[in-house]
Regions:
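Loop/turn segments within WD40 beta-propeller blades
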Residues: 50-56, 97-103, 152-158
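Beta-strand-rich domains and repeat architectures in extracellular enzymes and scaffolds
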Residues: 39-66
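Conserved strand-to-loop turn within each blade of WD40 beta-propeller repeats
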Residues: 62-65, 109-112, 120, 164-166
Length: 166
């Protein structure tokens, strides 16, 4: 009975162990040099896309509120506001954001059939064409005919990216 009692006390001690702070876990296991954290609160709905430029100085956030917000850590005021907000495609939630590895252009994908590319300051550079939904043989149309679900830049060539859809 005493062995069972000691074992249950050890189990209780193990169960009551404190839950580690997320930042501490990241520092220890991922080797990330984290010293500070902040909360960027400006979207009105759930954030579902983040893009971080290679230097870590700029972040793009996208949301189901249809907006993309650009944050610049070097020039951010103490009120932690984004320096630019825009809606890439009216009434379509943002699905994915990605900065190009070299040029810093921003690939913006939302639940629409047309990918968009913006420059580092959020100015629209390109809107790619939609595929022809009435084409019988889909091999003869270019572009998506339905929602885009994913995409990424080519790792070595900033003039190319790939997208996938439903």
């Amino acid at each position: 009975a005493q062995e069972h009692n000691e074992a249950s006390q050890e189990e209780e001690k193990e169960e009551k162990a404190p839950v580690p702070d997320t930042l501490d876990v990241l520092k220890e296991y991922a080797g990330l040099p984290l010293t500070r954290s902040i909360q960027l609160k400006d979207h009105t709905k759930s954030v579902c896309a983040l893009g971080i430029d290679r230097s870590g100085a700029r972040v793009a956030s996208g949301s189901t509120d249809y907006d993309v917000k650009l944050w610049d850590f070097g020039g951010m005021a103490s009120n932690l506001s984004p320096f630019k907000t825009f809606e890439p495609a009216e009434n379509y939630p943002v699905i994915q954001l990605a900065f190009a590895p070299q040029s810093k252009n921003l690939l913006c994908l939302n639940a629409a059939p047309q990918p968009r590319v913006y420059d580092y300051d959020g100015n629209e550079l390109a809107v790619y064409k939609k595929g022809d939904v009435f084409m019988r043989d889909m091999r003869h149309t270019t572009g998506h005919i339905s929602d885009i679900t994913c995409g990424m830049w080519h790792p070595l060539d900033d003039t190319h990216f790939m997208t996938g859809g439903s």
